[in-house]
UniProtKB/Swiss-Prot annotation:
Gene Ontology BP term (one): L-tryptophan biosynthetic process
Gene name for this UniProt entry: hisA
PANTHER family tied to this protein: 1-(5-PHOSPHORIBOSYL)-5-[(5-PHOSPHORIBOSYLAMINO)METHYLIDENEAMINO] IMIDAZOLE-4-CARBOXAMIDE ISOMERASE
Keyword check for NAD: no
Keyword Repeat: no
Organism phylogeny: Bacteria, Pseudomonadati, Thermodesulfobacteriota, Desulfovibrionia, Desulfovibrionales
Compartment(s): Cytoplasm
Primary location group: cytoplasm
SUPFAM superfamilies xrefs: Ribulose-phoshate binding barrel
Catalytic reactions of this protein: 1-(5-phospho-beta-D-ribosyl)-5-[(5-phospho-beta-D-ribosylamino)methylideneamino]imidazole-4-carboxamide = 5-[(5-phospho-1-deoxy-D-ribulos-1-ylimino)methylamino]-1-(5-phospho-beta-D-ribosyl)imidazole-4-carboxamide
Family statement: Belongs to the HisA/HisF family.
Name of the protein in question: 1-(5-phosphoribosyl)-5-[(5-phosphoribosylamino)methylideneamino] imidazole-4-carboxamide isomerase
Organism: Nitratidesulfovibrio vulgaris (strain ATCC 29579 / DSM 644 / CCUG 34227 / NCIMB 8303 / VKM B-1760 / Hildenborough)
Amino acid sequence: MIVFPAIDLMNGVCVRLRRGRADDETVFSSDPVATARHWQEQGGRWLHVVDLDGAFSGQPVNAPLIRSICDALDIPVQLGGGIRDAATAKAYLEAGVERLIIGTIALEEPDAYAALCAEFPGRIGVSLDAEGGKLKTKGWVADSGLTVDEVLPRLLEAGTAFIIYTDIDRDGMQTGVNLPALEHLAKASTVPVIAAGGVATLEDVKALYPLSRTTNLQGAVSGRAIYEGTLDLRTAMDWIRQQEKAEAC
């Protein structure tokens, strides 16, 4: 199991939003590259980056900064936000991003999404962002009217390599994860699932860990909690390693 430290980029700085609202932001760092290095030094095995400007505008905005982050790290980076065509995807992968997270076009343009998965096999994942059981698109401001169960078979058939599942109601709220919804998805999925939204404490990590042993849950993204100190990344990763080591004995 992996805890993915998150960097959300807006106007060139690291921010966290509450429930994805652009008007409810907290700036945590004015130096995203230094922040990325910090999370690597704290034991991060992956870095989760979101270009919020890109998500809201529908096109890449922070590409030079994202390249600088990739260049500064030895760990892989997964990126989402504003990736809505093959040219953008190719540019980010060539810039050093290991895998890409697609949201809007996966739901609104299924043929284009399937083509992306075919062109970059194993490197394209989908972001399923749910509020009240319905999936959102366009930076969480548009309602698709679809549910996870309705889209999952098509996404898997298209060649999705991994899934990020966000409970928007819990994102940035530090209220714990939606375990029933997450377990349902992780059991139904044939590819790795990563939880996002609500991971606030080590107890939340401990609650998720059993699912990583019995389902396709790969890990969880943590943002506000690791910035505000309610979850210590190194402590969480050490705890996970101890559990995995004990099970291997």
